[in-house]
Amino acid sequence: MLKLFSAFRKEKVWDFNGGIHPPEMKTQSNGTPLRQLPLPGRFIIPLKQHIGSEGEICVAPGDKVLRGQPLTIGRGRMLPVHAPTSGTVTAIMPHPTAHPSALPELSVIIDADGEDRWIARDGWSDYQCRSREALIERIHQFGVAGLGGAGFPTGTKLQGGGDKIETLIINAAECEPYITADDRLMQDCAAQIIDGVRILAHILQPREVLIGIEDNKPQAISMMRAVLHGEHKIRLRVIPTKYPSGGAKQLTQILTGKQVPHGGRSSDIGVLMQNVGTAFAVKRAIIDGEPLTERVVTLTGEAVGRPGNVWARIGTPVRHLLEHAGFIPTSEQLVIMGGPLMGFTLPGLDVPVVKITNCLLAPSATEMGAPQEEQHCIRCSACADACPADLLPQQLYWFSVGQQHDKATAHNLADCIECGACAYVCPSNIPLVQYFRQEKAEIRAIAEEEKRAAEAKARFEARQARLEREKAARLERHKKSAVQPSGQDQDAIQAALARVREKKGDDQPIIVAAGAKPDNSAVIAAREARKAEARARQAEKVQQEMAANSSVPAHEATEPEIDASAESVDPRKAAVEAAIARAKARKAAQAGENATADEKPAEPIDPRKAAVEAAIARAKARKAAQAGENATADEKPAEPIDPRKAAVEAAIARAKARKAAQAGENATADEKPAEPIDPRKAAVEAAIARAKARKAAQAGENATADEKPAEPIDPRKATVEAAIARAKARKAAQAGERAQAANEENEAEDPRKAAVAAAIARVQARKAAEKVVNED
């Protein structure tokens, strides 16, 4: 019983959804055996006849070639093409090929010499002793591709299968209603096909090998069964006739009951499929050592006088084949490459036969029927019922018309096998397959553009990264090539660094408590020590200068007479020396401010008294100078003195004394306030005092004109006394300034009023000086 169920399962076939049953037209061409046709005079071999990129050309115009000689080099998925006959390469140029768009593709043009000489052929009859990789490489280099219509490189397909293939399926369904190429090939070359199947099984090592053939080919079925008699590894499965049972996914489901997932391949479920024509080409490549240079082509249609199947060389013009088949064209004649459901109309008869050409259909006008006008979709869903891929052709049609590429992709447009079943059943005569092909082409173009954009972005980012690396390398080189210090400089640098490290090591860590103020007592003490040292040096220097100015020789003070030869005293020089002394005293006083900050301030001096004393001292100095002038009247006259300059110098001295007096006023702010002094009144009183002193001096001069002159006054002593008086006044003023700083609550005098008063005093003093000069 178990054996019965096992045998039943082995012969079981499944079904797929959808599908149609168009009228059979195979009897037009499958009744005659395969035949050879005369060679054409010129062959056109396109470089790309398969899925993938075209190979690299290895011939040039003028080269002599033999049949089977490679015209291109195949690397990776690039499949080489070979010369179909012996002859001369006349050109390599673009030429229209077998494509609905008739776009020109690069092709090699060969003029045949008629000899049809082969290259040296090396067959591997002992292929079972060869490695799997060697067999796959030979299949690839001999240009074998899928001859069922897809044109996928067979070597690449076998290489990708690897060790995961459990079932090898040989597709012999040939479901198109007009095509009989595989049918006739199985009738005439069944043994060679089985040899090719054994080679494929040797490479893949599958668990089972199945040959699927429709039941509308009785002669082919009988021939294949005869060859497979006694073969246990290869089983023949006869399936019901239904279009499109020859599709890869549909035949896989029929023979195994497994469905290929959306977007996947049959190899994902452990199944690999090859066409019977591909198996025959594999046998000739491995055992006979012949590259793929020809294939079986069906010539059929009511416009063909002698329909049948012929051996057509790759690159043969379509016109040449039809002429030898008795083609009688009519008005508006159509020539279709492929079947009526999955084929396409040729743009011209000069296109060549390629590896995927399996049929040339030339129907009459009555055979194909009058072209029907396309109408609007009525949403009948007949297309969805007929679709073998379980798609929604109606919805895909709307997406294609509306250029909604994303939605079309989301609805699995890529799973469409373009079988034409939907267009066949459409009552509105909508060419759905054409819309789907166009939409696929647009999606591929968009994907290619995105891929190029991504590659360009990757190149740009790589370039930016390279530039950044080069920039970093340049900066590193510049740093390394910078001027290095010499040995001595390096030693000095290391010594300095060592001192810094030692100092850092000696430093105690500073810990600051939260909320506490930093302890700067050490820094303040060091700063105060430096200031005290500087003040001491300044005080010592001032004392030395004052001692030098105050020291006068005793004999000069007591000598009653003035030596006539002695150098007379220049009053201007004396005034300059006095100004210098005052400046030095002022600097010394300023330097001593900070030194005496903590001492008890001296008793403040009344600025009015100081001003009066200064005026008296200046009057005495002037009187002494005038007495000196009278004493030397008979002697050599001294250099004349400019009275205006002297007046200006005196005014400057008075202004400085006034500033000192004003500073002293602030010093007495903390004491009992004295009666406020108006600076203008003080200046007026000082001017009056000076005028009185000057008049008294003049009166004294007139009174003693006839008498013996009084003892002359040394002008230098008078100048020194005046300088000492001014220094005392300035010191008192500075003491007042320190007292003012100690009392922050004291109100400061308006500086603008003081400046105005000082200016008025200077003007009055200048006028008084000019008056004195005029009186003299």
Curated annotation (Swiss-Prot):
Belongs to the 4Fe4S bacterial-type ferredoxin family. RnfC subfamily. It is found in: Cell inner membrane. Transmembrane segments: none annotated. It comes from the Bacteria. This is Ion-translocating oxidoreductase complex subunit C. [4Fe-4S] cluster 1 binds at C377, C380, C383, C426. One of its GO terms (cellular component) is plasma membrane. It holds the Pfam family Complex1_51K. [4Fe-4S] cluster 2 binds at C387, C416, C419, C422. PANTHER family: ION-TRANSLOCATING OXIDOREDUCTASE COMPLEX SUBUNIT C (PTHR43034:SF2).
